[in-house]
């Protein structure tokens, strides 16, 4: 299948991890492409745009079933993302470059530690 190793976990931990590592990305991608700016992206987009939109091309029937069967974990992750996006939004709206830079730094460090 291409997976590097088998991991044993509880059903709840599995569902929580899948909500975060897979399902949330599909929700975010689907929501992201709904921006009215999407119609104007031609000629301006590159790798980041392609990365963000790749999984928006999905089987909506299958993913609806998967999302609904894991709704508690997925709603938790969506709420977490909204909380963090609000922090970024507020820093930008308030013209608070120090807070924004710290938020970006925190994200970079978390990603680097994960690798």
Give residue ranges: language-model regions.
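Internal alpha-helical scaffold of NAD(P)-dependent oxidoreductase catalytic cores
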Residues: 1-54
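Alpha-helical scaffold segments in carbohydrate-active enzymes
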Residues: 23, 106, 110-113
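A structural signal for well-ordered alpha-helices, especially hydrophobic packing surfaces
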Residues: 28, 85, 89, 111-115
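Interdomain hinge/lid region at the active-site interface
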Residues: 38-107
């Amino acid at each position: 299948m291409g997976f590097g190793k088998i991991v044993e976990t509880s059903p709840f931990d599995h569902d929580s991890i899948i909500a975060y590592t897979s399902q949330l990305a599909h929700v975010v991608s689907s929501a992201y492409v709904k921006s009215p700016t999407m119609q104007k992206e031609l000629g301006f987009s590159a790798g980041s745009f392609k990365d963000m939109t790749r999984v928006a091309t999905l089987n909506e029937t299958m993913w609806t079933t998967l999302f609904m069967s894991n709704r508690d974990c997925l709603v938790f992750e969506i709420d977490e993302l909204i909380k963090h996006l609000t922090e970024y939004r507020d820093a930008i709206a308030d013209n608070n470059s120090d807070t924004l830079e710290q938020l970006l730094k925190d994200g970079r460090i978390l990603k680097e530690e994960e690798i």
